[in-house]
Amino acid sequence: RRSSDLTPLISMVGVTGSMGPFFCEFTLNGDLLPPQYPATYTHELAHLLGITSEAEANFYAYQVCTRSVNKEIRFSGYFSILGHVLANARQLMTEEEYKKLFGSIRPEIIELARKDQEYWMAKYSPLIGDIQDWIYDLYLKGNKIESGRKNYSEVIGLLISYNEWKKESNK
């Protein structure tokens, strides 16, 4: 693992890490913030270990990080899926239910997420980012990830299935 020499460019397109399949090496964006580093590292490590699905790599990162004895690493695991949870909840819940869920999140976590988004948006180029999104969506679909870039958020289905499996296993 190493930081990318192309950090400014990959920050412009919103990429935090990448896996180079030809050299079996992954790189991390040098602009990563401390709470993002562990989850991004384990996500890319999952790809190195052979997991191609972005949802499964997110699930792997979540599982590894949230089981750590280090509280910063655990936090990274939880924080890494917050956006996916909220995006899915907004689509599935009524406005009242969503507001209740959002209100249950500690204010300092919401503030950190807001600052995180501002940090990355200041580096992001919409034109270059849109082109990269389109190309990457085609790349994923060409590699049998039918949902393309939407696959990242499919981690929520994996988490729900895992929690249901755990409940059944503990009966």
Task: Give a label for each model feature.
Residues 39-51, 55-58, 62-63:
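Active-site recognition of the HExxH zinc-binding catalytic motif
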Residues 15-20:
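Helix-hairpin-helix/helix-loop-helix acidic hairpins
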Residues 8-10:
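Phosphate/adenylate-binding glycine loop and adjacent helical scaffold
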Residues 59-112:
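Active-site/pore-lining binding-face segments in mid-to-C-terminal subdomains
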Residues 107-171:
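Pan-zinc metallopeptidase signature
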Residues 27-31, 44-49, 71-72:
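Second-shell loop/turn segments in exported
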Residues 21-23, 33-37:
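Extracytoplasmic
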